[in-house]
UniProtKB/Swiss-Prot annotation:
Transmembrane segments: none
Domain remark in the UniProt entry: The IMP cyclohydrolase activity resides in the N-terminal region.
Pathway it works in: Purine metabolism; IMP biosynthesis via de novo pathway; 5-formamido-1-(5-phospho-D-ribosyl)imidazole-4-carboxamide from 5-amino-1-(5-phospho-D-ribosyl)imidazole-4-carboxamide (10-formyl THF route): step 1/1; Purine metabolism; IMP biosynthesis via de novo pathway; IMP from 5-formamido-1-(5-phospho-D-ribosyl)imidazole-4-carboxamide: step 1/1
Residue runs in coiled coils: none
The keyword Transferase is assigned to this record: yes
Lineage of the species this protein comes from: Bacteria, Pseudomonadati, Bacteroidota, Bacteroidia, Bacteroidales
Enzyme Commission (EC) number: 2.1.2.3, 3.5.4.10
GO biological process, one term: 'de novo' IMP biosynthetic process
Name of encoding gene: purH
Protein name in the entry: Bifunctional purine biosynthesis protein PurH
Catalytic activity: (6R)-10-formyltetrahydrofolate + 5-amino-1-(5-phospho-beta-D-ribosyl)imidazole-4-carboxamide = 5-formamido-1-(5-phospho-D-ribosyl)imidazole-4-carboxamide + (6S)-5,6,7,8-tetrahydrofolate; IMP + H2O = 5-formamido-1-(5-phospho-D-ribosyl)imidazole-4-carboxamide
Key words, A-Z: Hydrolase, Multifunctional enzyme, Purine biosynthesis, Transferase
Organism: Bacteroides thetaiotaomicron (strain ATCC 29148 / DSM 2079 / JCM 5827 / CCUG 10774 / NCTC 10582 / VPI-5482 / E50)
């Protein structure tokens, strides 16, 4: 197996021609002959260098509006021929197929076309067929052929040519083949993701959409994000988004999307520590902050309303990591941008995946995202006393928060304001006690408040504790074998309870 290979013939067919001129010039100086198609051939000839048309080699014209140009045995035979196999050499000589030693390809910009909002017909036309086939063929035969599969690889090729002329080592060819397969796998993943639109049970990513983060969950851990944050947000101020920021941003987006009313939420470690629905952003912020002004320090803020100057002046009084809104007025941005590192995001309209993935052990868990949002129609009153219209509003309000809180979770709310929550507890009773203690520590009166639970009550103990604190209405999934005991206690003490039939565990 020969280490060094000389480049005698290069097939060049690219979309992006910026940076190609230096390569073509150097190759010509090294005596390399060119083979190309359409626009690329015209580009090479415009530089003053001869270039043979693919059609002249194949004796077959480009057909179907350019859909079929290079897909021909005289092209692929020249790429895939194994130079150390006598049988291959005999066949290409018999059919007068020239050996192709270098393939330079740059694929149609499929992702950019999708991002531009183009029609499906235009998007389909940007699915490269010949180019991806050339990449795979040349990469497969890296023992004899060097492949440049994207504009990003123009410089490595030029550096190689400048270092030792039109020759390549096996190590260089193998490295370029690896990069080529990274390009082809990413390209196919992008096409799959377009057609799948988040429906599939497989998560596909590649190094092409990898973003290295400052670190992972802790400084001693490396961290990466695979995806396209630019499709979801415009970052208009602040430092680089961290691994932990992304976790909280994800939780914040999931939570705020539950609400149609103007709402402001404050999150810390993926859980809401403040949330309120109000007529204005300023009012919503003020009451959300009142829920837990201590935990709000260093949190992630999100609203579904436009942040104005009045709201920004109040928000600016505390330290926080990230703020997300659909828009900000000019004065608000000037105020919020006073802190250099503060991350300010404008949220865009973007389709989110319907599947969730979690790596564990030696595999990956996949599940449907919990997209169920209970409404009045889903509530079943299981007590003699029905909740009042105001209590129903609060129950649904609280249920959305508990759905997005770590289990076991209890949420206490009143007047469309989060009073307190107990989250991530091994006991539902402990979660309730935590919520009660927290609400009292910030001066909230629990009389007339409602309680939401992410799962059923195995015993009546939680409603007994809630009753003693003045809580008057409860929402829970139901389904315990001892539901009747819980319902009976509520009836005896004049409490209203509704069940939804939907559990919202979150681990």
């Amino acid at each position: 197996m020969s280490e060094s290979k000389r480049i005698k013939t290069a097939l060049v067919s690219v979309y992006h021609k910026e940076g190609l001129d230096e390569i073509i010039t150097k190759l010509y100086e090294e005596g390399v002959e060119f083979l190309s198609t359409g626009g690329t051939r015209q580009f090479i000839e415009s530089l003053g260098y001869p270039c043979k048309a693919v059609e002249d080699l194949t004796t077959y014209p480009s057909i179907l509006g350019g859909r079929v140009k290079t897909l021909h045995p005289k092209i692929f035979g020249g790429i895939l021929c194994r130079r150390d196999l006598e049988q291959d050499i005999q066949q290409i000589e018999k059919y007068e197929i020239p050996e192709i030693d270098l393939v330079i390809v740059d694929l149609y910009p499929f992702e950019a076309t999708v991002a531009s909002g183009a029609s499906e017909a235009d998007i389909i036309e940007k699915i490269d067929i010949g180019g991806i086939s050339l990449i795979r063929a040349a990469a497969k035969n890296y023992n004899d052929v060097i492949i440049v599969a994207s504009q990003a690889q123009y410089k490595p090729l030029l550096d190689m040519l400048m270092e030792h002329g039109a020759t390549s080592s096996l190590e260089e060819r193998r490295w370029m083949a690896k990069e080529a397969f990274a390009v082809s796998s990413h390209y196919d993943s992008a096409i799959f993701n377009y057609f799948d639109a988040g429906e599939g049970s497989a998560f596909r990513c590649s190094v092409n959409n990898q973003k290295q983060l400052r670190y992972g969950e802790n400084p001693h851990q490396k961290g990466y994000f695979y995806g396209n944050l630019d499709a979801m947000f415009d970052q208009i101020h602040g430092k680089e988004i961290s691994y932990n920021n992304l976790l909280d941003i994800n939780a914040a987006v999931d939570l705020i999307d539950e609400y149609e009313d103007l709402t402001f939420a404050i999150l810390k470690h993926n859980n809401a520590c403040g949330l309120a629905s109000r007529p204005t952003v300023l009012e919503a912020w003020t009451d959300a902050l009142a829920g837990d002004p201590v935990s709000a320090f260093g949190g992630v803020l999100i609203t579904n309303g436009v942040i104005d100057k009045a709201a920004a002046e109040e928000i600016n009084k505390i330290f926080f990591e990230v703020i997300i809104a659909p828009d900000y007025d000019v004065d608000a941005l000037e105020i919020l941008g006073q802190k250099k590192n503060r991350i300010i995001l404008v949220r865009k309209e973007a389709k989110l995946p319907k599947k969730q993935f979690r790596a564990l052990l030696n595999g990956v868990l996949v599940q449907d995202k919990d997209m169920n949002i209970e409404t009045v129609a889903d509530l079943r009153t299981v007590t003699d006393k029905a909740p009042t219209p105001e209590e129903v509003e609060d129950l649904l309000f609280a249920n959305k928060i508990v759905k997005n809180s770590k289990s076991n979770a209890i949420v206490l709310a009143k007047g469309k304001q989060l009073l307190a929550s107990g989250v991530g507890q091994t006991s539902r009773v402990d979660a309730l006690k935590q919520a009660i203690e927290k609400a009292k520590s910030f001066g909230f009166d629990l009389n007339g408040a409602v309680m939401a639970s992410d799962a059923f009550f195995p015993f009546p103990d939680c409603v007994e504790i809630a009753d003693k604190e003045g809580i008057t209405a409860v929402i829970q999934p139901g389904g315990s074998v001892k539901d009747d005991l819980t319902f009976a206690y509520c009836n005896e003490h004049g409490m209203a309870m509704v069940t939804t039939g939907i559990r919202h565990f979150k681990h």
